[in-house]
């Protein structure tokens, strides 16, 4: 019986000659690959005890579905209903319309990436964002590379390579993906000198550690965790005094970084870049796609003498930004010239600054959209996270719409909405399926309502 079924399985060319597949607009390479995979799957089914082969038309439909799935990009848009503004797995910051348009224009056209129009000669790609960064942070000079880990790697390689870097034990963070500050320091060709204890580091610890091989003092903002209780750390002003007294630079990895003060939005403990430099930090680095709300980038700002050395290091070319990212970054930074415009235009700031009343009203509008499609729900107050390793101990008061799953379990509803062509990624909390409105665009309400109704129906 099994042998007869194997003989009856159609050949690859036979299936490719079927009208259902011949008229398809799918790429021939994908079709052939899908035919082979479907036939392999069919053979496995026969070995597993399949009693009869499917009709050829059904087989062709499976092949087309498989080929169409292969054409879907793995990187695609999702609806973020988690309430986590800087969700690392969902791409962190969403670009403003201005930034997205600037990136698209740079991608489509030739540009002045490294061309000096005024003098008709080669220019520098650093010039496109340097003046803006200096204006916004108070730095003497600035540059940008492709992420903050790269920025730290480049800074230490250029300013401390072959020497010793002093850092507090309480600041030796893991920044994600198993990338740890001690390992980055070692990769730069530096020796790490750890001072103090996990919970307490004193001025005298730094002073006692400085020696002939010391090249820099490193401060790391512990943005993705907090040490509380019996603690002590040395303020930036004192660290700068110690470093400068020995002719050394003070370097700070700010992590998320912030151009504007976020305390009015209820986010505390995130120092602004300007505050860091004003305290005496010589070189600071921070991310572009976190609290700044721009594209992925590592921004380096500080004293001109150090920034120029960093620009000339061989690693700088390997870590440089492309034209689309530079265009998006310039557009994002430009919005910060007017704080009100920045909060209104940059999605990250708009989400983080949304008041509880605004979010409640937004949740009511989503609830109505769901009700219009026959989906029952209730409003739930939530504690939203900033995300991206920022303000880890703080929750922002928000609102969510909890969908009644009907005949489905909460997990089944979550899976159905997550496996859509445009996934809806939400939260399950206390056996409720929550659509947290802080991170949902209003223009997605109708799609969410239709998808929920279809899933529950």
Regions picked out by a protein language model, each given a short descriptive name:
Residues 36, 40, 81-82, 92-118:
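Glycine-rich phosphate-binding segment of PLP-dependent enzymes
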Residues 49-95, 99-102:
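Long amphipathic N-terminal alpha/beta scaffold segment
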Residues 305, 313-314, 321-372, 382-383, ...:
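Structural motif of enzymes handling amino- and sulfur-group chemistry
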Residues 356, 360-441:
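Conserved C-terminal alpha-helix-loop-beta "cap" of PLP-dependent enzymes
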